């Protein structure tokens, strides 16, 4: 055994060993050594995008998963930890353009490198189950599901709004539009309506919402709230304003302007209606109003993202059109509002300035009437400024509302809904913020949509026998539109129905389709004739999912939806895919920058900066190492390329070893909280591992000489050491169960301190206690630092008795070891802590009272005979003087 810790040698040896025995290959229905079924546990990290290199967020995520795997495996579970690649998407196209290579070439090269990085981390991944989203054997089943969902009406086609770059002749994602211009061309972006495919996720809205509350107790409350809010159930009234506006002799929208409101009690306060720029009434009015035409064009340049629209300036323009109020018969002016989405509800809203803050601001801006129709006792309405109580539906009563005066919110809604229903102009309705999922993307690098366009037959689904529709991997995007439109071999095909020349669909699927079910494909790897098979029934639902909070809504919601569709198709037997969810915190680091005269900031990596510290070790100034000139200290932020504050995991592994990187990321913070990077912390983790190795080396002879021993006969000093090791084991085991790995590392450090500090003689008793303590210590530390503990386990001979540490039985707390002949009891005098005493564990009340009264510290605070002495057995003596 080497006397010095060499991470490179230790870790290579461990990797070679694990590879030789195919250590992490998982099988279904695994048995224990007694032939009994092991309990399965499926733990999975959200699959990464193959961007080229792992970042510290990856390291933290996968280490959490790996620690969980190793702990559970030692506890007898049949554990699965797979890995795959979210390999389609826009970043690959951008990188391909920058490097003039096909996205496929860039993607596969990145995957190869990132796999070597994962291997160097010692992750317990079953690579036989690897899936890659851009491989035809995977996306074939995206296409198969698309066709099944199309057949059942769950997928349908309609026009949708996209960002169109007129120079590059391509569709841009919202994040590629900067200040209304294309990120590459700088051209003013146009909103275009094009046919797209949608999935009816709204058909599952109620079930998705119900299951958030009733079937996801193992999810963080924060995520469940985010999902509920995203689904956004609203109970209200949908009703129509009427009109006689006609075009070419036909009433527009059958003479009705439909709106939805959750505040039907304020219907008598309507002073205007606002419609989306794309609404039929807006289009009609614009034909005779050039100014309105320009305004609508301006609106279409804006964002269609709700978050953006919520914060942008609300603008409007009157159409010159009026609709009739369904209850009063009064004419209400119709405006075009840039804040109204055509894709939300009916693309129109009623305006009640007196009781809606947005409408109030809009009315003030454009000098529109404000009519209060709700009164809150003790309050006086004024149209000068908005007050929160104007929107109070809990305490308000209707006023200025005729027959509804005096009614509270619910009474008014019920009465108004009934009257609207009687008129045939409205009804109570439940709506959802959630909208159907647009899965079409006008991009190349994605799953081809399996549709063929025929002039005679229309849109024809690709026959199942012809799947997969294989995406050509030789295209190099140049920014001038989807290269599939120029790929003759892909594009031209015979119609499956009539046999005439036809054309393939060139849109591809949203990459969220890929990530909606990949975790099930891990369970049925290499299944060529089914999307999932019986192996999926064994592993799913997943026991523990691990990923960032940024995926709390879209990915997780789509995965839940996809699972329910698969259930309804008879492919799976469960409702929810992920039983437990852990959202790990971000990894933070310091930021440093210089700002030029124009305000542009240049960011410098922390490794290139030297700090000047004050006498308390706090940074007071910083200079760039290369030129010695000052840089600004920007504070601690999430590691990112934009702030140039990332740390290369591979550099850390090369310098210190994977176990150091793993130990630091687990120790520095609880898994669900943010982790602040610390070079000193990394050094500290490495020092600890060197101590671990040195202790193992120094105790090798003692362990070799250890033999079976009756622990009941141990001397008191040996019992004390054993008691402490088992107390720490008990704590660590509990922390592993709670996924509090930072305190597991603390327990490991405490145990090493305890073992190092033990002053025991060279006797069979000492050898037995140290050997047991060291074997417990190595198993506690193993899930976090598997390489060094594997090496020491082998070198010290523990493998002979317990087998490979991977499958060594988890140490059990010995209740006898925790027993103490004496206990410490605290003493309070008049409610204040004044001292403590050591008494026999079985001491009677009189003995305890006598010992407490004899304590020197206590005697200072009592005069004469105490009024009362209360003994709380095993804990406390309370003296009332």
Curated annotation (Swiss-Prot):
Positions bound to ATP: 641
One of the Pfam families matching this protein, by short name: tRNA-synt_1g
Subcellular location: Cytoplasm
Cystine bridges: none
Coiled coil spans: none
Lipid biosynthesis listed as a keyword: no
Keyword Ligase: yes
Swiss-Prot/TrEMBL catalytic activity: tRNA(Leu) + L-leucine + ATP = L-leucyl-tRNA(Leu) + AMP + diphosphate
GO-annotated molecular function: aminoacyl-tRNA deacylase activity; ATP binding; leucine-tRNA ligase activity
Enzyme class, UniProt record, top EC level: ligase
Protein family according to the UniProt entry: Belongs to the class-I aminoacyl-tRNA synthetase family.
Name used for this protein in its record: Leucine--tRNA ligase
Annotated gene: leuS
């Amino acid at each position: 055994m080497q006397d010095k810790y060499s991470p490179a040698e230790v870790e290579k040896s461990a990797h070679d060993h694990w590879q030789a025995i195919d250590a992490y290959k998982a099988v279904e229905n695994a048995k224990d050594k007694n032939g009994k079924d092991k309990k399965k546990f499926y733990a999975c990290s959200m699959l990464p995008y193959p961007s080229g290199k792992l970042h510290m967020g990856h390291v933290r995520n996968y280490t959490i998963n790996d620690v969980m795997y190793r702990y559970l495996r030692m506890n007898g579970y049949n554990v699965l930890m797979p890995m795959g690649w979210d390999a389609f998407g826009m970043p690959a196209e951008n990188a391909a353009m920058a490097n003039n290579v096909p996205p496929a070439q860039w993607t596969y090269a990145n995957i190869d490198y990132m796999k070597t990085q994962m291997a160097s981390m010692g992750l317990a991944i079953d690579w036989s189950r690897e899936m890659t989203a851009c491989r035809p054997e995977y996306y074939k089943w995206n296409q198969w599901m698309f066709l099944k969902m199309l057949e059942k009406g769950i997928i349908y086609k309609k026009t949708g709004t996209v960002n169109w770059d007129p120079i590059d002749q391509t569709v841009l994602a919202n994040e590629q539009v900067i200040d209304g211009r294309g990120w590459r061309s700088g051209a003013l972006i146009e909103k275009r309506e094009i046919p797209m495919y949608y999935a009816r996720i709204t058909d599952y809205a109620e079930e998705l919402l119900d299951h958030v509350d009733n079937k996801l107790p193992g999810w963080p409350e924060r995520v469940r709230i985010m999902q509920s809010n995203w689904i956004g159930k609203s109970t209200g009234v949908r009703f129509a304003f009427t009109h006689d506006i006609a075009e070419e002799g036909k009433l527009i929208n059958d003479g009705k302007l439909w709106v939805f409101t959750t505040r039907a009690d304020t219907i008598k306060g309507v002073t205007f209606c606002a419609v989306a720029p794309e609404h039929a009434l807006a289009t009609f009015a614009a034909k005779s109003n050039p100014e309105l035409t320009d305004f609508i064009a301006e609106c279409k340049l804006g964002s269609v993202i709700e978050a953006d629209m919520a914060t942008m300036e609300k603008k409007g323009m009157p159409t010159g059109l009026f609709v009739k109020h369904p209850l009063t018969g009064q004419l209400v002016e119709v405006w075009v509002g840039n804040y109204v989405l055509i894709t939300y509800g009916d693309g129109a809203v009623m305006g009640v300035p007196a009781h809606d803050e947005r409408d109030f601001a809009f009315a003030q801006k454009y000098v529109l009437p404000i009519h209060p129709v709700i009164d809150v006792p003790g309050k006086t309405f004024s149209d000068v400024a908005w007050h929160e109580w104007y929107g109070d539906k809990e305490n308000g009563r209707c006023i200025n509302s005729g027959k509804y005066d005096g009614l509270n919110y619910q009474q008014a809604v019920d009465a108004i809904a009934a009257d609207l229903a009687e008129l045939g102009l409205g009804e109570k309705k439940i709506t959802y913020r959630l909208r159907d999922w647009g899965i079409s993307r006008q991009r190349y690098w994605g799953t081809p949509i399996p549709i063929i366009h025929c002039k005679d037959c229309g849109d024809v689904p690709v026959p199942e026998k012809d799947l997969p529709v294989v995406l050509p991997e030789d295209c190099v995007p140049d920014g001038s539109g989807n290269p599939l439109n120029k790929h003759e071999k892909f594009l031209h095909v015979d119609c499956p129905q009539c046999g005439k020349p036809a054309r393939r669909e060139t849109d591809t699927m949203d990459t969220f389709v890929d990530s909606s079910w990949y975790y099930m494909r891990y369970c049925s790897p290499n299944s060529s004739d089914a999307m999932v098979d019986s192996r999926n029934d064994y592993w799913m639902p997943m026991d523990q999912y691990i990923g960032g909070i940024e995926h709390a809504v879209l990915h997780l919601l789509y995965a839940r939806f996809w699972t329910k569709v698969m259930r309804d198709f008879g492919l799976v037997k469960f409702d929810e895919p992920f039983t437990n969810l852990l959202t790990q915190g971000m990894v933070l680091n310091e930021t440093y920058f210089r700002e030029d005269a124009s305000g542009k900031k240049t960011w410098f990596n922390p490794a290139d900066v030297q700090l000047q510290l004050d006498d308390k070790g706090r940074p007071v100034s910083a200079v760039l190492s290369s030129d010695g000139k000052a840089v600004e200290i920007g504070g601690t932020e999430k590691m990112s390329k934009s702030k140039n504050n990332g740390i290369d995991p591979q550099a850390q592994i090369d310098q210190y070893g994977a176990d150091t990187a793993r130990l630091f990321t687990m120790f520095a913070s609880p898994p669900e909280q943010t982790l602040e990077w610390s070079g000193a912390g990394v050094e500290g983790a490495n020092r600890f591992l060197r101590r671990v190795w040195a202790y193992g080396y120094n105790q090798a002879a003692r362990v070799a000489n250890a033999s079976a021993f009756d622990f009941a006969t141990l001397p008191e000093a040996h019992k004390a050491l054993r008691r402490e090791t088992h107390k720490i084991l008990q704590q660590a085991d509990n922390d592993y169960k709670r996924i509090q790995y930072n305190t597991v590392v603390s327990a490991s450090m405490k145990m090493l301190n305890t073992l190092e500090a033990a002053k025991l003689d060279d006797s069979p008793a000492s050898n037995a206690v140290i050997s047991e303590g060291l074997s417990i210590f190595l198993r506690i530390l193993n899930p976090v630092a598997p390489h060094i503990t594997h090496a020491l386990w082998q070198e010290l001979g523990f493998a002979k008795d317990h087998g490979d540490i991977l499958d060594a039985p988890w140490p059990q707390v010995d209740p006898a070891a925790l027993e103490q002949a004496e206990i410490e009891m605290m003493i309070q005098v008049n409610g204040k802590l004044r001292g403590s005493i050591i008494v026999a564990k079985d001491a009677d009340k009189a003995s305890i009272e006598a010992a407490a009264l004899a304590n020197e510290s206590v005697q200072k605070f009592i005069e004469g005979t105490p009024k009362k002495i209360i003994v709380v057995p095993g804990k406390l003596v309370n003296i009332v003087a």
